[in-house]
Swiss-Prot record:
Quaternary assembly: Myosin is a hexamer of 2 heavy chains and 4 light chains (two regulatory light chains and two essential light chains).
Alphabetical GO biological process terms: locomotion; muscle organ development; nematode larval development; regulation of muscle contraction
Lineage: Eukaryota, Metazoa, Ecdysozoa, Nematoda, Chromadorea
Disulfide topology: none
Gene designation: mlc-1
More details: This chain binds calcium.
PROSITE patterns: EF_HAND_1, EF_HAND_2
Name of this protein: Myosin regulatory light chain 1
Region spans: Disordered: 1-22
Domain EF-hand: start-end pairs: 24-59, 93-128
Amino acid sequence: MSKAAKKKSSKKRSGSEAAQFDQKTIQEFKEAFGIMDQNKDGIIDKSDLKDLYASMGQIAPDSQIDAMIKEASGPINFTVFLTLFGERLTGTDPEATIIGAFAMFDKKDCGKIKEDDLIKILQNKRGEPLDEDEVKAMYKGKPPIEGGEVDYKAFAHLITTGAQDELASA
């Protein structure tokens, strides 16, 4: 198969990624897209990503944002967004997905984020925020927080293995 045929073939496959998700998952992607589309124009662009990082108290370098934008072949509407994430999530487990999300806030690339950042993420009004009682319940379970830093890999493991019940009921 020629390089051009392979390229064309792989592009064809990527469009079917959306078909692999159930309605609940697609709704979750819509909510995530809505959070990222800060100006609500139906397209995620550089300014949306900058605003998203700023809302989380982060400053992302232009090079990092440009790299994110370049992953798409054109404007990032919901269909493109779903396809990009579909390609990434195929064969991945929820724990790896959550770790990847937390890693965006790991400035030092050390496997930890600030406890304050975790609370901001969990209480972000643009998604499905946890209320004060839910945050208090999380702390009763003794999440992996030490010295004001969260081991987000251990935290992701807890919430994806059913241990969140232990967190809430401890």
